[in-house]
């Protein structure tokens, strides 16, 4: 228990430091980016592409399993393999959710009502469709990261996670700045930045587990608990029940947190979405810095004790 508490303290410090650096980088990048692109592009890129099309399918399908990883026994081989099997099982579901989100955004493109501001460029429909395709690729890369991420999460490797997330945010910000400020790219820059944000953790986690930890997390049957037991099992009942409960909770939480974003994305204009994004990013920065890492590590501690 003392080791778990020490890991929790280190985890809170690491995640808060990583979050602080990440938010500082994001804030600086957003200030510079907003001068290069208009409110309409900012609203569509941040709200539709980042929050809904990229993060939406991922949060809906993976958050329950990530929380279940905190409650798993890292020393139990079958429990660890159950986590890996579930992540591979959920991968097609995540892709299906992404396709459904993309279809909804395709048939309901961004609404541009206020066209009197000549300095605020409207979102091009062809660029918007290409950006959706790029975002789909980013979702696929993020899905391939999940098997190794949940293993790191179950083993409380918060230091590793903090470093990887910090470099991922840095890569995303630098990509956004280069594409918008130097190449004058608009909506597609958000999608390409998400590809960078998903690619860095994909390479980092897999390299760590293959090269350093010497294991390759792949789906395979669990080890039999009794001699002579031939029936193949791919997931323990306890892990399946725990993940189902957390999945349901994460679905409710996501709908409560993002209900207004969904309505604004499909009903509001892109200019209104841009104003909302600026206010939302600044208003929630303290909560994300202080309370989110503490909440996450509290769940990990209570699940392990």
Which ranges hold each PLM region?
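Helix-loop junctions and terminal segments of transmembrane helices
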Residues: 59-77, 154, 283-305
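N-terminal membrane topogenesis motif
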Residues: 1-28, 43, 66-67, 74, ...
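Transmembrane helix-loop junction
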Residues: 35, 71, 154, 180-181, ...
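Juxtamembrane interfacial secondary-structure elements that flank transmembrane helices
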Residues: 59-76, 99, 103-113, 144-154, ...
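Substrate-agnostic recognition of the 12-TM MFS/MFS-like secondary transporter fold
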Residues: 87-90, 146-169, 255-257, 277-280, ...
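Interfacial helix-capping/hinge residues at the ends of transmembrane alpha-helices
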Residues: 30-31, 66-67, 146-153, 161, ...
